[in-house]
Every structure is written in structure tokens, then in C-alpha cells.
Amino acid sequence: MDKKIGVYICSGCGIGDCVDKGKLAQVAQGEYQIPVLRTSAAFCLEDVRLIEEDIEKEGVNNVVVAACSPRVNTDIFRFPAASVERVNLRELVVWSHPSGHEETQNLAHDSLRMAIVKAQKTKIPSPFTQANERAVVVVGGGVAGMTAAVGAADAGAKVVLVEKEGELGGFALKIARQFPKHFPYRELEEVGVDLLVRETRSHPNIEVLTSAQPEAISGQPGKFEVSIKANGEVKKIAVGAVVLAIGWRPFDPSQLERYGFGFSPNVITNVALEEMNRAGKILRPSDGKGIKSAAILLCDGVEDEANIQHGAHVSYLVALKQAMYIRERCPDSTVYIIYRDMQTPGQYEYFYKRVQEDAGILFTRGKVRRVSCDQNGGLVVDLQESLLGPEAQLQVDLLVLATGMVPVPSESEGLNLDYLQGKGLPLSKYGFADSNFLCFPYETRRTGIYSAGCVRKPMDLAAAAQDGAAAALKAIQCIEKSSAGAAVHPRVGDLSYPSFFLQKCTMCGRCSQECPFGAIELTPEKNTPFVVTNRCRRCGTCMGACPVQIISFDDYSVDMVASMIKAVEIPEGDDEKPRILVFACENDAYPALDMAGINRRELPASLRIIPVRCLGSVNAIMAADAFSRGFDALLLLGCKSGDDYQCHFIKGSELLATRMENVRETLSRLMLEPERAQVMTVEISDFGSLPTRLKGFVDSIKAIGLSPMKGF
């Protein structure tokens, strides 16, 4: 199909008062000979029909809308038969720059030029298609796993639930009672896991395999092949998505020897106390005598960082619950809860108050200096910085250590993935399934595999059930999107995917190494890359990684960005008008710029902004093109990296930091100052301070001087 571009220039929302739309029309038709051009005071209202008519009657299949931000009116400017490129005249030109100023008009011209060139280079993506399975495998038969299985089955999916033990229930079978789930949230409740087990086993859409474990998982969303070993036999099934709910194991108490663990049998863990209460008696382990006094220590000091991360607020709630256990079993006892912090989120604050009302339960903030034995077999707990005084001692019969919940490792007991990047899931610092915790909590770094329960973060039974239901919804979404050949997240609905011009491939394998999601594999014969399409999240990290630029998308490529760079009009050096190219991450940085415009914060007119899918997609050659073209500086706006990363694609900013070394080498080769290329971390909430930071960067470039490459 021949490409036909239509440009639609809006003059509403103050656009026509700030810039000359006639001159914009001249850019479109005079410089690019656009065959269809229309103007309107509001294309977002009834005049949208003009665009629809041009698509239907004039054969327009590439639409350029010069109006408001691409983040608004997305439903209005969506045309199935055409690709759409938005020119952000309203927020990033009119609302953020002086009206009628020459540089404001120049910015509008360049914004339109870049959009037209992008439209020229864009192909309408064709979706990847395959035979998809409407089935889900859930690994783990605890509360999270069973809830996920029931949720997916209720949605119409066939579910296979795989549990390594001989019975369903997971760690919930070892819990005596659970925290309050019902108003007024004061009293402990029965666990009730047997009801969930019966519901799971009786559901017509669920097949339960106990004493079973996955031997291998291969394939991609929509069509995973799972090999399951059960009762000595291997069974192969095809599913569309996977839910991982393999649970947790107690934190290793040998790391808590400083609190007397292993020194005295009367120093036990909270797991041991749970078992005691479930058995019906709480006695002193050393001699079987009753408890007159006990202390529960929340191991939450600076030296207990790992235990804190594995316990979170759950350890605090368990301490409250177990204090009630001891008081119920030993009514004349006194229980001390020793803490540094106390966290009881949400409705659990009512439960906290209920425990405080018990005169036999005493709370003291403090730090345990030493635990020793007295001559009667009891324990002496020496406290510092306590509410009882600078130095204090507690005489107790039993010391309970609050240990955390360590996630079961996915590699050894959960998945056994047949992926180039390894058998297990990429994990966070403390062993939980890695994900963008705020935006995509259930999505692991293996597309189509969703984590639920304590493999994702520490949580109680109620939260685990909620987690399982949420993971089931994500699994169903994955199956639906995969069947349409569309990305699941974060670029939901994106039909594009990477293609490779293998004739130029150097077989370095960098694309497969840097892909955050294991979407690129290598052929065993030639070591050339190929994409496992439905694993791909369309971030373009592979495109940024390739040293010979052989990777592209139908609607995003190195050639497209290079053409957009060349479309910008660079003033002659004696004009003293700097031009700074900005690559802005579309997930945080670009919305922050947008918000600055909405709030009428002035931005430097010298910036020429190109949104990118992720900073990880920025190839070093793009920087070289910018400086060779005569840009005075390059600014890359991206997300926070590190353990607390905020990148939607995990490590885009981190990868770019490495590639910046190549950019600086390019600058040295061009005899340019390295300060001309900078990376700036931006959160969406930074819109208030971002204009000042940008102005500071522009001023620093002016101080260095304009690029000597202008005019070459």
C-alpha cells in the first residue's frame, strides 16, 4: 500500500494565538509536499470527522495531528486504518513558551518537521500470530496459588495446579490462627484453608497435580510448553500463561546468634511458637514448664537488614498475634514485645489497639545488647535505649525471635525455564521476583509469568489471596493480548516487534544479553539472534545495544530517529541560538515535561524533544548523528536506576550509563567537550523543578559555547 500522509493543524486551546498556523502549513506543504492538509479550531470535537473522511475517501493512511499532547484524547485520535503521529503543540510549545516569539514559532516548525519525517518512516505494524492456548498453569498450591487457580478457572481458563507437596495448603497448614479479616478487626480468626482446598479440588476447570514439579518451561506467552513430573511420570501441557506462587521458607535463624539462638533452647523462632500453639500447649522447651514471662523480639535493628526486608510489616503483626497466643495459653503470664519500629497498616491498626488493651502485654522500644541464662534456666535480656530506661533487664522464661519470610528460589524449585538467560527468574536484592514494583507488581521479568504471594513480597494470608486473584487477572490479560499479537505491558496493545537485518549481523550476542526480558535467543548453528515475539515488551533495548544497527521496529528505528534529527533546522553559528537534542523516556520524563506545560511552566525554547520508548533504546550512533548535525548538546532524560529502579523496562538508564562512554568517545573524536552530553534522572513528579534544571543545563552549554560543528 502506498503511503499517504495527512497533516491536521489545530488552532484551539491558544495554539492559534501563539503560533502562526499559516507558516506551519507552509512547512508541511512547502517542504514536504503533504497532499492532504486541514486546519480546525478543534479536531478533538466534531471536526475529527474530517480526518475520518480523509482516511475513508482520500486514502490517507498516515495521520499527523498537530494539536495537544499524545497523552490526551487518545480515544479520539485512534484510527484503525491509519498510523497516527501526534505533534505536541499545546503543552510543549504554546503553554510552555512566550506567545508570538520567533523561537516559539521555530520550535513549532521543528516539532512538525520531526513528526512528518517520523510518519514517512513509519510502517503500520502487522501483528504476530500463532495458535494460542487458553489455559494457565499455577505453580504452588498455597493460598495465593489456589486463589489464582480458582480466579483463572472462573474466568473460563483451563487450569493445571502443580504442588510439590502431597497436599494443598502450603504454609497455611502450619498456621494456628490468622489476623483479623472482618470488622471490627480485633480478634484472631480461623485460617479456613480447608474451604479453599475443597473449592479448588471441586472446580471443573482445575486439574490438581500434587507431589509434582515443573521440569521445564519453554515457549512464550500464548503458547508455553510445560513439562511436569508427577508420580514418576513426565506430563507435557501447553498453556498461555504461568502463575508462580511457590511461597516462602523461614529466615535462617542461625544468623541471629547474637540474640541467643542456639545458645539456649528457650530462644525460639516465631515459626516454632506457631507450631507450639497449633499443638495446643506453649511450654518452656528446656524443661516443659509453663510460661510466666516471655519476650518477643522484633529483630529490626540496623544489623538485621536482611531479616527486616524478608519480614516487612508481617513480622510485626505476627508478634502481636503470638503475644495473644501466650496470654491465652498462659493467662497469668507477662509478655514483652521489644521493637524498634511497629508497622500495622490499614485496618490492622485496630488489632494493634486491641493487643495494647491487654494489661499483660507490654511494649518497649529498645535494642537488645545481650541475652544470657540465669541459674534457674531462665533468660536475661539486657536492653539499651529502652523506654524502661537507658539500661534495663528483663527476666523471661521464653524469648521468641521474629524471623522473616524468605522466598523460595524459582530456579531450584519453581520453573526451570528453557531460556538463554537462565532457568530461574531474575531476582531482586533480597531474592524476590524482580519487577517494576510500583507500576507492574505482578509482572516478572519473564513476560507471561506472573508472581503471587510471598515469592513477590512478604505478606499475610489475606494479602496472599488478593495477590493470587490479581495474578490470575494478569494471566488472563496476557492470554487475550497474545492471541491478538499485541504487547501485554507496559506498551499495552503495541503490535510492533523487532526485526533483524541479519546480513550485517556480527553475531556478538549483545542484543540477547541486554534484553531485560529474555525475548531474544540465539540460533545454535550460527549464533544469530531471533526474537521470541510474545516475550518481547517492545522497549527497544536491543535496538540501542546493537553496534551495527541491524535491529528495528516497523514504527521505531535508528533510521527513523536519525531522520528526525536531520529534520531539525539548525541556525547558523553566528545566530547564537543553541539547539539541544533531548531524548525523553516516554514513561516518566516525557509526562513530566507534559505536566510542566500543563502547569504553564516555561521551558527553554532551544530544546528539541524526541520521545523514546526507553533510554535503553538509544543507540550510540544517534548521539553521533546529533553532534555531526550541529546540535550543541545532547540531554537524555530517564528513570532512576539501581536497586530501587523506576524504569518500566528494568535497566534502560543503567545500560545507557554504560553506553555513554561510547558517546563521550565520539565527542572526543569530534573535539567536543564531554559536558555536552548529559543524563538527567527524572520522575513524573519532578515537573515543578524540571524547567529550572533544564534551564541550568542550557545555561551551562551557553557558557561552553556553541558547537563548532554547525554549518558542516
Identify the function of each model-found stretch.
Residues I580-V582:
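Long, charged, low-complexity intrinsically disordered regions
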Residues V618-F627:
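Thiamine diphosphate
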Residues M1-F530, N534-P578, N587-Y590, E602-L615, ...:
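Residues forming the flavin
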Residues P674-F712:
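Divalent-metal-activated hydrolytic enzyme cores
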